[in-house]
């Protein structure tokens, strides 16, 4: 298959992966309305084309938390990467490192902190959930600090897991799930050889290191379900702010007031995110939520965004809507499942090229020049309500 665009990786990954793994990453919560809106709303954001601007000196470089980034993109935290490619977290981290952008290791990664951190030169970021087991949280934070992780991404939009109906149909959960997964694995030989046989161990490395025993997929599902903490509040995060002396980012913000609370709390950054449409179906897409949040806290805190970003044009759109940097999720996982480190490296090259084209044709020579003024109204059609104020006066 010829890969000429980031979207090609999704089709390739679907052919390679057992259905339980493909649909686990591809699916969303309930009827997947928000999952679809994430992509559709972003696609409706029209950019303002400008000409004759002498774009010979164009730069994608930016700085975030005193780190230089080759472009305003980071690989976000995605669980179970090591089930999508052989030691997948290591491969993805190496691709990000080579491109000059951060990699974020998930709490529920296959490869533990101690395996991924030494594989790259750049300090990685570490993502942590709010869990009932505070001992695990402290253990993970201590290990992340010892490994030199620079930034903590604290996910707060999972006090309880979302209802993901696709998982029951595909075999990730539901009746006879283990047998269904086995039958799918043996009928997908490329994955079975690369990951099933040669990608072992398949336990959840960070959890296993804490529990002192291997933690497989069934253990992971049970342990995680029992450890989400619906009682969490801002006060419960104070000990983490005191313990972690590096940048701390709160992930899962969709409301301006929550963004203001993050500023008051002392966070260094927020991620405008609905968890890729995997938590509460029917909430705002990130593209719709972002402008109001940017109006509320831009300049007071770093604003990152994810959910629905599939290519370099989407990155430029998110920056124009108010983000400082974006996180990739499904987009890089599709590429990882298709071609490992080389796939992620190629995806990042594609995104960089697409960003350069978009910036050249909108007259933005640097990331700081991608602003609300880069946006226009979609031809003859109102933008989604949350975006409409930004287009005022710029109708094409």
Curated annotation (Swiss-Prot):
Binding site for substrate: 24, 129, 164, 278
Cofactor needs: FMN
Catalytic residue list: 275
Annotated localization: Cell inner membrane
Domain (FMN hydroxy acid dehydrogenase) ranges: 1-380
SUPFAM superfamilies named in the record: FMN-linked oxidoreductases
Pfam families (alphabetical): FMN_dh
E.C. number: 1.1.-.-
Swiss-Prot/TrEMBL catalytic activity: (S)-lactate + A = pyruvate + AH2
One annotated GO molecular function: L-lactate dehydrogenase activity
InterPro entries, sorted: Aldolase_TIM (IPR013785), Alpha-hydoxy_acid_DH_FMN (IPR012133), FMN-dep_DH (IPR000262), FMN_HAD (IPR037396), FMN_hydac_DH_AS (IPR008259), LldD (IPR020920)
Role description: Catalyzes the conversion of L-lactate to pyruvate. Is coupled to the respiratory chain.
Family: Belongs to the FMN-dependent alpha-hydroxy acid dehydrogenase family.
Stated name of the protein: L-lactate dehydrogenase
Gene designation per UniProt: lldD
């Amino acid at each position: 298959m010829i890969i000429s665009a980031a979207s090609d990786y999704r089709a390739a990954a679907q052919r390679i992966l057992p259905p339980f793994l493909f649909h686990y990453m591809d699916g969303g919560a309930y009827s997947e309305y928000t999952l679809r809106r994430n992509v559709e709303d972003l696609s409706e954001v029209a950019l303002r084309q400008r000409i004759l601007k002498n774009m010979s000196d164009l730069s994608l470089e930016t700085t975030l938390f005193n780190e230089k980034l080759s472009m305003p993109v980071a690989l976000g935290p995605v669980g179970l990467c090591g089930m999508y490619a052989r030691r997948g977290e290591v491969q993805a981290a190496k691709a990000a490192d080579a491109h000059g952008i951060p990699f974020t290791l998930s709490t529920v990664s296959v490869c533990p902190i101690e395996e991924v951190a030494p594989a790259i030169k750049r300090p990685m970021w570490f993502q942590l959930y709010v869990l009932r087991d505070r001992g695990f949280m402290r253990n993970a934070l201590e290990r992340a600090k010892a490994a030199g992780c620079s930034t903590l991404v604290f996910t707060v939009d999972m006090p309880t897991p979302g209802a993901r109906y696709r998982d029951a149909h595909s075999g990730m959960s539901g009746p006879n799930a283990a047998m269904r997964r086995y039958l799918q694995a043996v009928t997908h030989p490329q994955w079975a050889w690369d990951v099933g046989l040669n990608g072992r161990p398949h336990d959840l490395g960070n959890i296993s290191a804490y529990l002192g025993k291997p933690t497989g997929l069934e253990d992971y599902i049970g342990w995680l379900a029992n450890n989400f903490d619906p009682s969490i509040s801002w006060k419960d995060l104070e000990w983490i702010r005191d313990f972690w002396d590096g940048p701390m980012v709160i992930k899962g913000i969709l409301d301006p007031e929550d963004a203001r609370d993050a500023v008051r709390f002392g966070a260094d950054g927020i991620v405008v995110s609905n968890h890729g449409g995997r938590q509460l179906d029917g909430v705002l897409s990130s593209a719709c939520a972002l402008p109001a949040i940017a109006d509320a806290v831009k300049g007071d805190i770093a604003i990152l965004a994810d959910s629905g970003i599939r290519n370099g044009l989407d990155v430029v759109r998110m920056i124009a809507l108010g983000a400082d940097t974006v996180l990739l999720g499904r987009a890089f996982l599709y590429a990882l499942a298709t071609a490992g480190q080389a796939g992620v490296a190629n995806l990042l090259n594609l995104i960089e090229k697409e960003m350069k084209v978009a910036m050249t044709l909108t007259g933005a020579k640097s990331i700081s020049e991608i602003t609300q003024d880069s946006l226009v109204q979609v031809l003859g059609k109102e933008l989604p309500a949350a975006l409409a104020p930004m287009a005022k006066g710029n109708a094409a």
